[in-house]
């Protein structure tokens, strides 16, 4: 297991590499280069510069998140072959600079969705919050405007250029069966997995967030049965999973420790995002601290499953609360995620030492 920390780059992330380097137990980052438009090839020069900055700070850069999949691939348009070719070249360039895992998603239109970005807790901290009932009567356009207006920082998956043609894109997904989206996904995997196998990269698909359908858009990555279908689409270790405890765990029907054990034993868990959520009702939750008792997930059981079944995976704390007056990108503060790492590392040490006696 390698503990990492997500970093968006010096241009847009208020958290510095020096900050990250000072968190105990962090080996490296899960990187992002969100300034590159979706569908474009990531150049060797840009990747080299990014990785060099990370390495010069004394950190590893072996995982990249969000090499986003162009909407034309998800829709199955003829132009998808152009974007798949760009994607393969990007993978080759990433591998040449030591990248071993790429975390991505196959969510149409929205990468993730919350109804509040700064929900105030009783202790004065703020957190990400979701209430499905609040979507009633709202349009996707309403949600996009409210989300973008709520943050002074760029949001991953909510890049304005991606959402510029929202009406047109939404219309193309209307009445699309889940099986059709899954077939388009198979086409994408069949196009990239040979390159992954050649260069030694493992793809790690991130679950739908939250773990159910929204606005009638087909979604195919939010349950154990969905994950089983995905690993069966292309039977290769290069076609692996990123098990996000908070995304899958937003639906209490998903047994996150069991999912980690099942796919870890298959060798198909390349990465894990570890965070806690607090259930507040049906399809209603807030993102709590990482401490088990603050939320509804058993973080010890999750870490034990990673320890016993996914020991060759990269993990990171996921979203955190805004505490101690910190401001920044919603869900990605320094202080609460650093606390999360300390807690997760404490669990890991306890599990390691308990198994030795």
From Swiss-Prot:
Molecular-function GO term, any one: manganese ion binding
Transmembrane segments: none
InterPro entries listed in its UniProt record: Man_deHydtase (IPR004628), Xyl_isomerase-like_sf (IPR036237)
Cofactor(s) this protein cannot do without: Fe(2+); Mn(2+)
Protein's pathway: Carbohydrate metabolism; pentose and glucuronate interconversion
Catalysed transformations (reactions): D-mannonate = 2-dehydro-3-deoxy-D-gluconate + H2O
Keywords, sorted A to Z: Iron, Lyase, Manganese
Enzyme class: lyase
EC number(s) given by UniProt: 4.2.1.8
Biological process terms in GO annotation: D-glucuronate catabolic process
Described function: Catalyzes the dehydration of D-mannonate.
PANTHER family (alphabetical): MANNONATE DEHYDRATASE (PTHR30387:SF2)
Family to which this protein belongs: Belongs to the mannonate dehydratase family.
Matching NCBIfam families: PRK03906.1, uxuA
Protein name: Mannonate dehydratase
Organism: Cutibacterium acnes (strain DSM 16379 / KPA171202) (Propionibacterium acnes)
């Amino acid at each position: 297991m390698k503990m990492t920390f997500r970093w968006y780059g010096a241009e847009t992330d208020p958290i510095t590499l020096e900050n990250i380097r000072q968190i105990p137990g962090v080996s490296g980052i899960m990187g992002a280069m969100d300034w590159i438009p979706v569908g474009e090839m990531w150049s060797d020069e840009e990747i080299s510069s990014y990785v060099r900055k990370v390495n010069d700070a004394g950190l590893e850069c072996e995982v990249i998140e969000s090499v986003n999949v162009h909407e034309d691939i998800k829709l199955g348009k003829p132009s998808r072959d152009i974007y798949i070719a760009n994607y393969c070249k990007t993978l080759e360039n990433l591998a040449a600079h030591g990248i071993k895992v790429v975390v991505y998603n196959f969510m149409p239109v929205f990468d993730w969705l919350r109804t509040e970005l700064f929900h105030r807790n009783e202790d004065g901290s703020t957190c990400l919050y979701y209430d499905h009932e609040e979507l009633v009567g709202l349009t996707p356009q309403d949600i996009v405007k409210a989300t973008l207006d709520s943050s002074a920082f760029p949001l991953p998956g909510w890049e304005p250029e991606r959402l510029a043609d929202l009406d047109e894109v939404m219309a193309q997904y209307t009445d699309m069966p889940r099986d059709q989206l899954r077939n388009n996904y198979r086409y994408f995997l069949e196009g990239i997995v040979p390159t992954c196998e050649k260069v030694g990269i493992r793809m790690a698909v991130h679950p739908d967030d939250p773990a159910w359908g929204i606005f009638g858009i087909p979604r195919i990555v939010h349950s154990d049965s969905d994950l089983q279908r995905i690993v069966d689409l292309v039977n290769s270790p290069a076609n692996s999973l990123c098990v996000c405890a908070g995304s899958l765990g937003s639906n209490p029907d998903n047994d996150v420790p069991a999912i980690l054990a099942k796919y870890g034993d298959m060798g198909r868990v390349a990465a894990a995002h570890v965070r806690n959520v607090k259930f507040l009702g049906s399809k209603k939750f807030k993102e709590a601290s990482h401490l088990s008792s603050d939320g509804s997930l058993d973080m010890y059981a999750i870490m034990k499953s990673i320890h016993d079944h996914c020991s060759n995976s990269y993990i990171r704390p996921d979203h955190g609360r805004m505490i101690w007056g910190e401001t920044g990108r919603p869900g990605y503060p320094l202080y609460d995620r650093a606390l999360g790492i300390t807690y997760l590392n404490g669990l890991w040490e306890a599990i390691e030492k308990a198994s030795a006696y």
